[in-house]
Amino acid sequence: MPTININKVDLERLSNISLSDKMIEDRFPMMGVEVEEIFEEVDKNGKKQNMVQFSINPDRPDYLSVEGLARGFRGFMGINTGIQEFEVLNSNIKVTVEENKTRPYVAFALVKNVLMDELVLESMINLQEKLHWAIGRDRKKLAIGIHDFDKVKAPFTYKEIRGDEIKFVPLGYEDEEMTPREIIEKHEKGIKYAHLIQDDKFPVIVDLNGEVLSMPPIINGTLTKVTPTSKNLLIDITGTEKEAVEETLNIIVCALAERRGTIVSVDVNGKKYPDLTPKSRMISVESINKKLGLNLNPGEIIQAVKKSGMDALYEDGNLIVKIPAYRNDILHNVDLKEEIAINYGYEKFEGKLPSVATTGSKDSVEKKCSAMSDLMIGLGFYEVMNLTLSNQDTLFEKMNLEVEEKDYIEVLKPASIEHRVLRTSILPLLLETLYINKHHSLPQKIFEIGDCVIIDENDTETDTKCKNIKKIAGAITHPLTNFNEIKSSTGALLREFFEDFEFENYEHPAFIPGRCAKIIKDRKEVGFFGEIHPEVILNFELEHPIVGFEITIE
């Protein structure tokens, strides 16, 4: 889970409450936020500061700043309950978006008269970086730019340019102008995120005079650098997924509004941002009590809803719940039930002993998986853990596989275009992991043990006709890797955990012909290994040879 370090005085100031260490340690965990450490540190002026380190659940990105965390705590403690309304003032600021295939979605907002100081600036920068990881997937899905609005002139243009078309001074360089191509070759951030630029097309945001605000997702310009004296902040979010871009903008502007900032709209190709209109969901009182094992009346439930920063109206056995725009974690009614449980008070729930005595033990398959993990680590591999949800592009298209829709399970209403399909294989996700880590040194040896989900029409035990299959997969990349290296690692694993296996030549679209073998046990195929085809390597935007294997455990 991501962690954030928060100045205790700043937290008290925003929470409108004096906080003892005991209160912090007792109350924050009850609202789902773990307290890792309370400590002292010396700031750059030599003064001691009381700090608190919190662990934040990934589903609460609005808690990744002191502003959002304090807002949630005020509600939890009953200081300010109900939905917090944020007024958005109209403006004539416009942004023209020209065609941009690399990062097609963009949203802007202006927050004026922010009460800025060193603490606020530090909090804002930390929130920006945490959101880059939590939602932006290290800027792959989205990137955030925050600018001193007073340094530029509207209107603005978001467009793609060639690598040598313009020059500007990037953040971190005081007076050295560079072209976009020079930035990705020389600048620290440019080198780190150069893999996000495609086909020598560089997205830029420029103002009326052609001054460069930003080259997303790489770097901002020095011209609009935010300082403790800045007060009017222009925020831009660019990315590959519209919903994530808009939700991230809402989180940031609402955090800055906690610093007395005034939110001002920006017209982006005819659409006004930000849109802070609350969402709504209907949920029955009966279903809430059934899930929580309680017998709460509507008034008690509404009180808990209001403490969570939402509003609710009771109507014919149901609650109509208003959800603020900065809450992107309320996807289903079960999420509302969790919020009600938290704000009713976990300490009020009573545990019940089961009527039948049972003795637990570790599942035999899990024991085997644990032993496999130890062996792979002993062979020099690093273990990774990916989500079971993926997408058709990663699982099939990049692997050169032709698969019909009936052969995999697709999510009806996915929260993200990257998480639309339940994975049927682990190896493609390992290649994606190598892509994410391509800027690290070689060799890289990774493995994963996890569930894949397949359709089984002959399954008579469930109504879904689906079942989980436990698999293990591994991948190695470096300039000299070859078939023998992956055969050696796979063989060591098989000799330890499988008996009476044999290899046969195998033609697999993702592997080089003649350099792939399938693993046979009891006359059934249980896995394969070999050298990844160069076309697949390029599909994942990788550069060095890769070998890999995948074996079905159960």
UniProtKB/Swiss-Prot annotation:
It is found in: Cytoplasm. InterPro entries: aa-tRNA-synth_II/BPL/LPL, B3/B4_tRNA-bd, DNA-bd_dom_put_sf, Phe-tRNA-ligase_IIc_bsu, Phe-tRNA-synth_IIc_bsu_arc_euk, Phe-tRNA_synthase-like_B3/B4, Phe_tRNA_ligase_beta2_arc, PheRS_beta_core. GO terms for cellular component: phenylalanine-tRNA ligase complex. Its EC number is 6.1.1.20. SMART domains: B3_4 (SM00873), B5 (SM00874). It is an enzyme of class 6 (ligase). Its main location: cytoplasm. Keywords: Aminoacyl-tRNA synthetase, ATP-binding, Cytoplasm, Ligase, Magnesium, Metal-binding, Nucleotide-binding, Protein biosynthesis. Its cofactor is Mg(2+). GO terms for molecular function: ATP binding; magnesium ion binding; phenylalanine-tRNA ligase activity; RNA binding. It catalyses: tRNA(Phe) + L-phenylalanine + ATP = L-phenylalanyl-tRNA(Phe) + AMP + diphosphate + H(+). Residues 276-351 form the B5 domain. It comes from the Archaea. HAMAP family: Phe_tRNA_synth_beta2 (MF_00284). Belongs to the phenylalanyl-tRNA synthetase beta subunit family. Type 2 subfamily. This is Phenylalanine--tRNA ligase beta subunit. The gene is pheT.
